[in-house]
């Protein structure tokens, strides 16, 4: 690697590359979430028969992973670059390796391994066959072929590629701490994110109001159900995301027991499943508008029989 790309140049390079592969460039979704997979641009679009190719950066919050800015690679909030392609291209791994070349990483000169790591997200009823991608001993990407999302079997199968941008940038720039990553020329990652990292860690572990969070969870759950009763999928899913983040804050605070934890996850999962079913029904009612005419006619005719 000759030129060391800045963090924002890595993002721009990946955006241009996946745009060239036919992906729409979406923007980060404006609700807290623990992973790019939970964005409606993945969770909702991975289900149902319609094609979907998208790429986007997703800031991902994991309160329990906060370390007050003292750990060089463990963060309350990190950034993922998410690629979802449905149906999955047969050459998705080759496309991924070519993306690394665009970043200046020649696969022939590095030890790149696909290590089996099947994926599951219990809180959304989602699972798939997966691999971690290791670059010279460091995990930089998660590869997943979704088999189930929101409790529904996926058909066609969606391929998801999730780059860990901080890890990738640390490798490309040869720095040991994420806070030393150059975000833009002359501006370090730590100059932007170190103080927020400390403050969010302090809040998550020491300051959050447990009673308020417990009350909020109940309210968000009820509001999601109320929206679903009216067939309002997207507002309902927003409240599912709020439930998830509220639970993560409670979990980080140590406010839920092991038994209660399983119960909260089940409650979020039940909502996510209803959202998924309602979304597919909504798309069907619209006539699956992203399908080509021939496939749409066949599917709708089958359902009418």
UniProtKB/Swiss-Prot annotation:
This protein's UniProt keywords: Aminoacyl-tRNA synthetase, ATP-binding, Cytoplasm, Ligase, Nucleotide-binding, Protein biosynthesis
Pfam families with a match to the protein in the record: tRNA-synt_2e
Record InterPro entries: aa-tRNA-synth_II/BPL/LPL (IPR045864), Gly-tRNA-synth_heterodimer (IPR006194), Gly-tRNA_ligase_asu (IPR002310)
Record-annotated membrane-spanning stretches: none
Cellular compartments annotated: Cytoplasm
Superkingdom, taxonomy of origin: Bacteria
Reaction catalysed by this enzyme: tRNA(Gly) + glycine + ATP = glycyl-tRNA(Gly) + AMP + diphosphate
Gene3D superfamilies associated with the record: Bira Bifunctional Protein, Domain 2 (3.30.930.10), Class II aaRS and biotin synthetases, domain 2 (1.20.58.180)
Record-listed E.C. numbers: 6.1.1.14
Entry GO terms, CC: cytosol
Annotated PROSITE patterns: AA_TRNA_LIGASE_II_GLYAB
Gene Ontology BP terms: glycyl-tRNA aminoacylation
GO molecular function annotations of the record: ATP binding; catalytic activity, acting on a protein; glycine-tRNA ligase activity; transferase activity
Subunit structure: Tetramer of two alpha and two beta subunits.
Family: Belongs to the class-II aminoacyl-tRNA synthetase family.
Name under which the protein is recorded: Glycine--tRNA ligase alpha subunit
UniProt organism field: Streptococcus pyogenes serotype M4 (strain MGAS10750)
Origin organism lineage: Bacteria, Bacillati, Bacillota, Bacilli, Lactobacillales
Chain's gene name: glyQ
